[in-house]
A protein has these predicted regions:
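Extended, structured polyanion-binding interfaces
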Residues: 1, 9, 24, 100-102, ...
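The substrate-binding groove and active-site-proximal loops of carbohydrate-active enzymes
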Residues: 1-5, 52-70, 90-107
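Acidic/aromatic-lined carbohydrate-recognition and catalytic surfaces
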Residues: 2-34, 119
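P-loop/Walker A phosphate-binding loop and immediately adjacent motor/lid segment at beta-alpha junctions
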Residues: 11-14, 106-107, 111-114, 122-123
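Hydrophobic faces of well-ordered beta-strands that scaffold small-molecule active sites
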Residues: 22-24, 85-87, 126-128
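Active-site beta-loop-alpha junctions enriched in small/polar residues
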Residues: 25-31, 90-92, 129-133
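Glycan-recognition surfaces
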Residues: 32-80, 112-170
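Active-site groove signature of glycoside hydrolases
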Residues: 72-96
Length: 170
């Protein structure tokens, strides 16, 4: 996707095109349904990964696991010149580990690690997204910016009700 690498692309955007800040999207589980077991991310920090009951690989919740995962991934992004991250799909984690971790266990350590790592790597420049479940927004120790609703689709009137409910309860 980036013929000369991500760092080169970001440097080009900033120096030649005047882009002040570059952000990267990522999912709280690594990707929507977790990490690819044969992918680079899973291979780079295997002790930081746990397998859910349905076989998804996601950052673990025990002790240093989530910090190890986020530090490895976000460290690479920071070294490439990324300035902030938007971490999506946060409320999916508690559903993915249902029956094996409590909602609090599913989120507290992972959010604490994410906030700590993004604070160190990006000066706290973190946008939390799709994390409108209470176990998510009450377990973020320091990141203040949260998108509190799922996607709003103005051309789909049925999406308005869900959008209003999610924002009213947050």
């Amino acid at each position: 996707r980036f013929p000369h690498g991500l760092a080169h692309t970001i440097a080009l955007l900033k120096t030649h095109y005047g882009v002040r800040s570059v952000g990267v999207w990522q999912a709280f589980q690594g990707y929507w349904n977790g990490l690819d077991e044969s992918g680079v991310a899973a291979a780079s920090c295997p002790t930081a990964i746990t397998t859910t009951a349905n076989g998804c690989l996601i950052p673990g919740s025990r002790a240093e696991q989530p910090a190890q995962f986020w530090d490895a991934w976000d460290g690479e992004l920071a070294e490439a010149g990324v300035d902030f991250v938007k971490v999506d799909s946060q409320s999916s984690t508690s559903v993915m580990v249902r029956g094996t971790e409590s909602y609090g266990e599913a989120t507290w350590g992972r959010h604490q690690a994410l906030d700590e790592v993004t604070s160190r790597r990006f000066g706290g420049a973190l946008i939390n997204c799709m994390g409108m479940a209470p176990e998510d927004y009450w377990h973020r120790p320091s990141s203040p910016i949260t998108r509190s609703s799922d996607d709003y689709l103005p051309h789909n009137p049925d999406s308005l009700g869900e959008h209003l409910i999610q924002n009213a309860y947050c």
